[in-house]
């Protein structure tokens, strides 16, 4: 079930302050965030965020196509190593 339209998108307050300060200063540093649940807003376009995946901060450069998605979608938390190989086919 999606979020109600009347509530608006969820963004942590500290995240708005950090993004506003970064865009005002003109510096292109990575903004470290832990809020994977926050929605990407139009004022974040062009900024680079370091989204924490439980192990490290994954750099995410925000583009126009990302607006409306969550930050956590772009920083995977699990490493996929592929499926295990079939032991029968290895012996041949």
Curated annotation (Swiss-Prot):
Record Pfam families: Ribosomal_S19 (PF00203)
GO biological process: ribosomal small subunit assembly; translation
UniProt keyword list: Ribonucleoprotein, Ribosomal protein, RNA-binding, rRNA-binding
GO MF term (any one): structural constituent of ribosome
Signal sequence, renumbered to the chain: none
InterPro entries in the record: Ribosomal_uS19, Ribosomal_uS19_bac-type, Ribosomal_uS19_CS, Ribosomal_uS19_SF
Key word tRNA processing present: no
UniProt keyword annotation of Hydrolase present: no
Domain of life according to the entry: Bacteria
Function: Protein S19 forms a complex with S13 that binds strongly to the 16S ribosomal RNA.
HAMAP family, alphabetized: Ribosomal_uS19
Family membership noted in the UniProt record: Belongs to the universal ribosomal protein uS19 family.
Protein name: Small ribosomal subunit protein uS19
Protein source organism: Xanthobacter autotrophicus (strain ATCC BAA-1158 / Py2)
Gene: rpsS
